[in-house]
Amino acid sequence: MPATRNQDELVRTFKAILKEERFGSQSEIVNALQAEGFGNINQSKVSRMLSKFGAVRTRNAKQEMVYCLPAELGVPTAGSPVKNLVLDVDHNQAMIVVRTSPGAAQLIARLLDSIGKPEGILGTIAGDDTIFICPASIKTIDETLETVRSLFNYSE
């Protein structure tokens, strides 16, 4: 196999190996792509591709932490099935907390960060299944809470 291939083949192979849900590190992905004939691939390129396609680390059926792609690739929108991943939205006087399906928090936080300050969101911190939202102002936290809830058609 040639050492270099075109970008479409690389993307197709990258997506295919992530669907296997067995790669727990970026170096394992690099090795798999090199074994497929992409000799010019390196860790920084894999890192950029993981970010570009919204890959997240989640537990597979064997309970191992692995990289996988979300069902819908690209930047998610509120109209996509991502809203089905939100399980709970609650708040106190200073912060909004969103609970998600396991492995979905980073994907949803990415969407929330993209709407940002105009909708009252200063920033987010995401774990595996929990997102902390820092409102732009605690004076308008109730409005920000309603914005977040309406994005995901969530009602108590």
Curated annotation (Swiss-Prot):
Gene3D superfamilies given in the database record: 3.30.1360.40, Winged helix-like DNA-binding domain superfamily/Winged helix DNA-binding domain
PANTHER family: ARGININE REPRESSOR
Family designation: Belongs to the ArgR family.
GO molecular function annotations of the record: arginine binding; DNA binding; DNA-binding transcription factor activity
Organism the protein comes from: Shewanella frigidimarina (strain NCIMB 400)
UniProt protein name: Arginine repressor
Membrane-traversing stretches: none
GO biological process assignments: L-arginine biosynthetic process; protein complex oligomerization; regulation of arginine biosynthetic process
Function: Regulates arginine biosynthesis genes.
Taxonomic superkingdom: Bacteria
A GO cellular component annotation in the UniProt record: cytoplasm
Pfam family, one: Arg_repressor
Gene designation: argR
